[in-house]
């Protein structure tokens, strides 16, 4: 029978058909090779937007710096970064006037956070530029290396464990005439193998001390490393993103804490909330504008797009904003918040790995590191690359480019949102003093603008005024990419609004299926995704039931765990059949052990182990949840775990799922190839941290683990804990006198050894 596809839509309101327009099947594009070219593009573009600014030289590093602030106002529509200080300050003042006490209260909240935050806050986050090794590392390792170097240079404030004290060390380190660091390097030796008598290469890892003078250290401390942003859909060209080092991260964190606190109090801000909460917030603003545009007014909405938001923002402007926001606060607080923008005004962009060259005729491949770009002969490059290098050369120092204007992606999302909202706030009638007025939504660089006026001319005038106001603050609304509609239809941060937000279920499609973490997590994530989409994205019961069946099928094929009575033969089916035959209650077997699927759309919230627990054979229960099984990751599993989900569009989302530790929660082993590289030393450090942390957790099981108050080292904390526990156990008769004495003796010995060290 032929089905006419248009019949499917007869009963569907137009806005619900959005899910059928989904273009993103398949994998997103990933970048290969170096990001050097993209980074040079960013640096050159940023300088071009501010080219009529003033040039100065950094007295410490000698880096040339361009300052566009209060520069000439643009005469055309080209993007530019000439923000005017007085306009920014005035916008802040009006924002405060409309929200009395907002800055004061946010400062008080932030001050509390500043005094309580521990330095381990900086271990969150992924890749971080490690200035000691001059390349990227996981955040925790980069922090550990920084602290280790600080201590070996006599900077000890960080020992308190408070972030603010670590930042005190960062400040002191910048005044040092030199800093001594340890670098890892590799020695290769050719030796004859005793057994095979062949020559083999032996690798050993060496550590050597290396001194950085003040200038070199400052350059490293102010460096942002760059990488190419992966998995961006709908773009032909890749672009560069920045990973700042540990010196900058802590200061940025405090500024963003303040800005987040302000954003939470602003009804036009799309940050820091997300999901349904964000939709509710936005729907309120739209409702307000539509109810107020009675019969006398018309209302239009612009789905806005800004040209190169980050590259036209300026850290000097952020400094002005912070100075104003914190104007009545204690000196120490104002200082600590102003350091991040000051560091960003003096930032250096690391150009990445450099360029790959290959000569087809000579079959040669070679890498030109970024450090060589300053003085290499340019005739080897193609035209576009040659132009890039010529442009960037005056800015180069030691393979990094001086980049004073611009913000690099994703650094001050909250603070730049405050700046955007301050313009939306100026749309009230008491400020426009005319018949048109506006309001809107802002989330980092994305905005929606709602303009009300008595007639079309008024709408046009309102939009023009908004556009010009933005220019004064270094924001460039793109006339090409923004479009205007009758209020009631617009898009904001990938939410489509049409008389209410439309569920765009197809956005979630990429997160359906098997994640590939392990059998236990994958089952849990799979059903949670279906459950969440029933709650948030209009996934109907019939479709959900089908999604569930497809998921189970996919899961069984992925892990080769077809039902015990199946005819499909895989490497695993032999073992599964054996288990099936000797199990009395076959319904109790997990799907990953060849059992049946008991999930339906009513019980998706229950972890599979709990769902089947009462149906399991006793010996199966014992095997499944055996805490002594060496393959189980029993890292004090919290009842909630997080998985990173990649939707088709927009940022990666963190999704919570229930976790039950079983023999299926294995953790895949690390690839061994790292053991032969110069990173091996780092790996050994990592294992040492792991051991220390595991030991610490044995003394402080998560139930009793409160952050130690006062300043004591891990060892001191463990010793005092051991003594208390031993005394309680001895007095209640759980341990004998000899054991008690031995524990006490061991504790004293450890203390003695520490004193001698």
Swiss-Prot record:
Known EC number: 2.7.7.48
Q: What processing steps or modifications follow its translation? A: Phosphorylated by host PRKCA.
Which GO molecular function entries does the Swiss-Prot or TrEMBL record give?
nucleotide binding; RNA binding; RNA-directed RNA polymerase activity
Q: Where in the cell is it found?
A: Host nucleus; Host cytoplasm
Locate the motif Nuclear localization signal: 187-195, 203-216
**Gene Ontology, cellular component aspect:** host cell cytoplasm; host cell nucleus
In this protein, which residues make up the domain named RdRp catalytic?
Answer: 286-483
User: What domain of life is recorded for the organism?
Assistant: Viruses
Q: Where is this region: Promoter-binding site?
A: 249-256
User: What is its quaternary makeup?
Assistant: Influenza RNA polymerase is composed of three subunits: PB1, PB2 and PA. Interacts (via N-terminus) with PA (via C-terminus). Interacts (via C-terminus) with PB2 (via N-terminus); this interaction is essential for transcription initiation. Interacts (via C-terminus) with human PKP2 (via N-terminus); the interaction competitively inhibits the interaction between the RNA polymerase subunits PB1 and PB2.
Q: Which family does it belong to?
A: Belongs to the influenza viruses polymerase PB1 family.
Quote the function comment for this protein: RNA-dependent RNA polymerase which is responsible for replication and transcription of virus RNA segments. The transcription of viral mRNAs occurs by a unique mechanism called cap-snatching. 5' methylated caps of cellular mRNAs are cleaved after 10-13 nucleotides by PA. In turn, these short capped RNAs are used as primers by PB1 for transcription of viral mRNAs. During virus replication, PB1 initiates RNA synthesis and copy vRNA into complementary RNA (cRNA) which in turn serves as a template for the production of more vRNAs.
Indicate what this protein is called per its UniProt record.
RNA-directed RNA polymerase catalytic subunit
The gene it comes from is: PB1
